[in-house]
Amino acid sequence: MQENHKSWIYRFSLLKTQEDFVLRIFVISDTHGRVDKAIEIYKKLDDIDLIIHLGDHWNDARRMKEQLNVPLIGVKGNMDGSFDREGYHILETDFGKIFIAHGHMESVKQSYENIMYKAESLNCRAAFFGHTHIPLFAEAEGFYLLNPGSLSLPVGGRKGSYAVATVLPGSLSAAILYEDVQQVPKTESGSIKNMLNDSDRF
């Protein structure tokens, strides 16, 4: 994990056989100091190649990096004192570039337009972000948005949530998962266009 919170480009091209060209990513956000739960969940998952922590708190990502033997990308969030417009990362995969940010600098609680515009201006095909504590996976015209929600401080009566993203050379898919699998609360999903400027969620 990079110690500097400025923008970095990560290249993750899997050196696997053509039949096994899959990148599985454990995506979490807004753990707010309660990282033990995220570590416990990771240990129950199979075939994870990469962890992405989308901020709040930065030290949680550092702790996970120290305790787990797996590549990890972390960004700083608003609770980490980061208000830098360059505080994002770009992950280059065989699917394409993925924009990685906490989301507060792109005002994702008001609209997804800013983060989509910024990501697309950097030639990214997807944006992973946190900040809202509301899980989301949506696609429009080949562009994807993923927010894993929050494991520690979910909102709207949801259980704590996280995501597992699967990246292939021609596709990106993701599953929003909950710590209590017997209760699956509502998840924001569907068309990005229908969600733009829909501030009633917050």
Predicted features by range, described:
Residues 32, 57-58, 79-80, 104-106, ...:
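Catalytic metal-binding/acid-base residues of hydrolase active sites
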Residues 126, 134-141, 171-202:
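A short C-terminal boundary segment appended to hydrolase-like catalytic domains
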